[in-house]
Regions:
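Sec-dependent signal peptide recognition
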Residues: 2-9
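C-terminal motif of bacterial Sec signal peptides marking the signal peptidase cleavage site
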Residues: 14-17
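Bacterial signal peptide processing site
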Residues: 19-21
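Extracytoplasmic/periplasm-facing segments of secreted or lipoprotein envelope proteins
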Residues: 23-50
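Exposed acidic/polar residues on beta-strands and adjacent loops within beta-sheet cores, strongest
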Residues: 32-40, 79, 127-136
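Mature extracytoplasmic domains of secretory-pathway proteins
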Residues: 42-106
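C-terminal partner/receptor-binding element of secreted or periplasmic proteins
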Residues: 108-136
Length: 136
């Protein structure tokens, strides 16, 4: 009986060491650029999956994190420039792939530039219906 208990304990220890720790979606790097009334946000994101099978769902989740400003390691400052008028994202499945420069996919979350009144531009929070995801 004691031998069975030890075998079960050893098995549990080995199995717990073999399971992958879940990866939480997070920003690996970010860069913002402003010019007049235009604010662009460029981010590199690690997805919370080994592979990204549904780009649309993953992209929408990333944009929602940007809107909610709730990435684990990064907080964006929307108090000075407001919400972005454009977001460019490179998605990676792991930090290892990020270091290698191996993207899973990339996309832009864009709107048309308002040429009639350049002082009033769409942003991702106030005018989400004016934006679309464009895959590169």
């Amino acid at each position: 009986m004691k031998r069975l208990e030890i075998s079960i304990l050893v098995s549990c220890i080995l199995l717990s060491g073999c399971t992958k720790e879940p990866v939480e979606m997070d920003v690996l790097s970010s860069h913002s650029a402003t010019s007049g009334n235009w604010y662009e946000l460029n981010i590199d994101v690690i997805a919370d999956k080994d592979t990204v099978s549904d780009r649309d769902a993953c992209s929408n989740e990333i944009i929602q994190h940007v809107l909610d400003n709730d990435f684990h390691s990064t907080r964006f400052s929307y108090d000075l420039s407001g919400y972005p008028n454009e977001v460019t994202v490179d998605v990676f499945t792991s930090e290892k792939n990020f270091k290698k420069g191996k993207t899973a996919y990339s996309f832009d979350y864009v709107t048309d530039f308002n040429t009639e009144n350049i002082d009033i531009q769409n942003n991702i929070k106030d005018n989400p219906d004016e934006f679309e995801i464009q895959y590169k």
